[in-house]
């Protein structure tokens, strides 16, 4: 199967696609992590995403020009970074989209001399914990 896969910086016109990716990815995350649906992501709006596009680095993964994944990273004043809003559409899991997004963020952070990176995830979602662990977190 041949397909085109790219990762690029997101722009304001991507905000709705980012919102849709995270909405679908979050539904899956809540089920797999066995957590309460009232987590903050549920209330994020397209306007919130547009604001983050101005203050954080936001990347998108696309397969055949279809948005499939997204990730945000903010470099803090102490030269650490925080990864947030990382999600891949469930139908694109396990084909490398998430790993590629993390690797792009990793290269971005290295180029900015960031030495420590933080993220949060549910410890009850064992596959995701293993995913992060295998990537060096």
Kindly label every feature range from the protein language model.
Residues 75-84, 93, 113-114:
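A conserved beta-turn-beta hairpin within the catalytic core of GNAT-like acetyltransferases
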Residues 109-121:
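Conserved GNAT acetyl-CoA-binding A-motif
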Residues 6-20:
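A short beta-loop-alpha structural element at the N-terminal edge
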Residues 88, 94-107, 133-134:
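Conserved acetyl-CoA-binding loop-helix of GNAT-fold acetyltransferases
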Residues 6, 23-50:
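Conserved GNAT-fold acetyl-CoA-binding loop/helix
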Residues 60, 66-74, 82-87:
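Conserved beta-strand in the GNAT
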Residues 10, 86-88, 121:
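Hydrophobic adenine-recognition pocket in adenosine-nucleotide-binding enzymes
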Residues 119-129:
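Conserved beta-strand-loop-alpha-helix junction that forms the acyl-donor binding cleft
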